[in-house]
Amino acid sequence: MEKQILLLPGDGIGPEIIAETKRVLEEIARLYHHTFQFVEGRIGGDAIDATGSPLPEETLDLAKGSDAILLGAVGGPKWDGNAPEKRPEKGLLQIRKALGLYANLRPVRVLKPLMGASTLKEEVLADVDLLIVRELTGGLYFGEPRERRQINGEDGAVDTLLYTRGEIERIVHQAFQFARTRKKRVVSVDKANVLESSRLWREIADEVAREYPDVTLSHMLVDNAAMQLIRDPRQFDVIVTENLFGDILSDEASMITGSLGLLPSASMNTSKVGLFEPVHGSAPDIAGTGAANPLATILSAAMMLQYSFGLADEAKAIEVAVDRVLAQGVRTKDIAKASENAVSTTAITNAVMEALALKSASSR
């Protein structure tokens, strides 16, 4: 298989974790006889410093010509005083919009060696493996009008929660398609007891469900879903929800694992082109120290192999390699206990690559 992958290192620790993930992908290409062509572009604060724009046209052209995009991180205090249009995060919003990346995927899988890092009890965490599918381009964050105005003689503000049938149908279809490759259960999260947009969402989810008789659909109000994620996260397989609810629930679910340094994510469109990135931020305080944890980015690359390229075996090989490394007690500083010796960004990547090579040798 031949694929072009756009690397967007971005800011802070981004260049370090992207460089290490590229090494893992090169090893996958060698072991499984693929050809990955890597191109690199600027985004975020790095792009602002170099070009004045958080998303230069050159980067957007590279994105449109690539099969998938791997992003490091954007942002940092250096650019906090910039105007909104000149903030690093604007580049990420712009590339999502330009590529029509409407589906955000946030897998939450609790790894046995790191159960102690979570604030939840181990019996609650055992076998947690869920996927949150969040609608990314509609809803309250994008609806118009959005404005300040005078209301009955005092300051007021208006935001608009707007969804169309097409926006709801396509994200719900995505959720059902992902569920078919998992445990075949979808929970649609809404606020249908209060919001008209949620009542439409629920009606359309029921209609879409009839096209997937092999998948079970249930509905849950968002306040109950927030509680159930903590009470019993094992009950969930695929959660699908609108933008605001998904933003909140995915951050809540991320803490089930106990470490942001292990959480990958993806933003995808209908054609399976995706932008893959770690959930964590740019961590400028440790940039250049060799202490960054690359595992979330490496696992994001595994998502890319599975969801954009259809390479399920290769994706699984990376996940198994990461699991093996953690089971061996190899840790970067962010996930190491006080009594454990932390290793560098490069060292933990080397361990992942060694685990990949061992798995490949054993399967011959």
UniProtKB/Swiss-Prot annotation:
Gene3D superfamilies: Isopropylmalate Dehydrogenase. The keyword Flavoprotein does not apply. Its EC number is 1.1.1.85. NAD(+) binds at residues 76-89, 281-293. It catalyses: (2R,3S)-3-isopropylmalate + NAD(+) = 4-methyl-2-oxopentanoate + CO2 + NADH. Its main location: cytoplasm. The keyword Acyltransferase does not apply. Binds 1 Mg(2+) or Mn(2+) ion per subunit. The record marks 141, 191 as: Important for catalysis. InterPro entries: IsoCit/isopropylmalate_DH_CS, IsoPropMal-DH-like_dom, Isopropylmalate_DH. Pathway: Amino-acid biosynthesis; L-leucine biosynthesis; L-leucine from 3-methyl-2-oxobutanoate: step 3/4. GO terms for molecular function: 3-isopropylmalate dehydrogenase activity; magnesium ion binding; NAD binding. Its cofactor is Mg(2+); Mn(2+). Keywords: Amino-acid biosynthesis, Branched-chain amino acid biosynthesis, Cytoplasm, Leucine biosynthesis, Magnesium, Manganese, Metal-binding, NAD, Oxidoreductase. Homodimer. Belongs to the isocitrate and isopropylmalate dehydrogenases family. LeuB type 1 subfamily. Catalyzes the oxidation of 3-carboxy-2-hydroxy-4-methylpentanoate (3-isopropylmalate) to 3-carboxy-4-methyl-2-oxopentanoate. The product decarboxylates to 4-methyl-2 oxopentanoate. This is 3-isopropylmalate dehydrogenase. It comes from Shouchella clausii (strain KSM-K16).
